[in-house]
Amino acid sequence: MQPGGQPDMSALLAQAQQVQQQLMEAQEALANAEVNGQAGGGLVQVTMRGSGEVVAVRIDPKVVDPSDVETLQDLIVGAVADAAKQVTILAHDRLGPLAGGMGGLGLPGM
């Protein structure tokens, strides 16, 4: 704080730039992180990057039944949804603390 209770703008700018850099690094790490989703007790597993890209699908041969394709389709959709949920949780865990740091820049009302 400067005299008169005003925030030191150069210090605020430096802090904001530091938080921005940390956020960019965390976003890059998140985009490259991989999570696993599953359905059917692990019969179908999906690996997804934090960017949302599906990089692997593993299907247990026990669930492959040509006369019941719908079940396999449902399991794949469920595994992708589970992986997407895991990405959301990971993003919250990794980016949440940085977003919370934005409020501590010393500006009134933040």
Swiss-Prot record:
Official protein name in the record: Nucleoid-associated protein Mvan_5528
SUPFAM superfamilies cross-referenced by the UniProt entry: YbaB-like
A GO MF label: DNA binding
GO CC, one annotated term: cytosol
Localisation per UniProt entry: Cytoplasm, Nucleoid
Organism of derivation: Mycolicibacterium vanbaalenii (strain DSM 7251 / JCM 13017 / BCRC 16820 / KCTC 9966 / NRRL B-24157 / PYR-1) (Mycobacterium vanbaalenii)
Assembly, per entry: Homodimer.
Keyword annotations of the record: Cytoplasm, DNA-binding
Family the entry assigns: Belongs to the YbaB/EbfC family.
